[in-house]
Amino acid sequence: MARVTVQDAVEKIGNRFDLVLVAARRARQMQSGGKDPLVPEENDKTTVIALREIEEGLITNQILDVRERQEQQEQEAAELQAVTAIAEGRR
């Protein structure tokens, strides 16, 4: 198991408080959202994987925001399509 130095990750995010928020958000995505890790797992927990992703510059708060917006738009489009299909079926 590789050691993660938090200082490297803090430098990527800006401060340790935002680092905690971004790492927790990303770890939660992997744990409950079914998102795949962007770095090799190496038998690490999701929090460690999230910190390694941040350390390598693969994840930032802005990246997470953009991805969530894209997913939300895709889901809304799918819901609209389903509603349209139902409405057309009733005509």
From Swiss-Prot:
Its EC number is 2.7.7.6. It comes from the Bacteria. One of its GO terms (molecular function) is DNA binding. The keyword Iron does not apply. It catalyses: RNA(n) + a ribonucleoside 5'-triphosphate = RNA(n+1) + diphosphate. Keywords: DNA-directed RNA polymerase, Nucleotidyltransferase, Transcription, Transferase. It is an enzyme of class 2 (transferase). It holds the Pfam family RNA_pol_Rpb6. SUPFAM superfamilies: RPB6/omega subunit-like (SSF63562). Gene3D superfamilies: 3.90.940.10. InterPro entries: DNA-dir_RNA_pol_omega, Pol_omega/Rpo6/RPB6, RPB6/omega-like_sf. Belongs to the RNA polymerase subunit omega family. HAMAP family: RNApol_bact_RpoZ. The RNAP catalytic core consists of 2 alpha, 1 beta, 1 beta' and 1 omega subunit. When a sigma factor is associated with the core the holoenzyme is formed, which can initiate transcription. Promotes RNA polymerase assembly. Latches the N- and C-terminal regions of the beta' subunit thereby facilitating its interaction with the beta and alpha subunits. This is DNA-directed RNA polymerase subunit omega. It comes from Enterobacter sp. (strain 638).
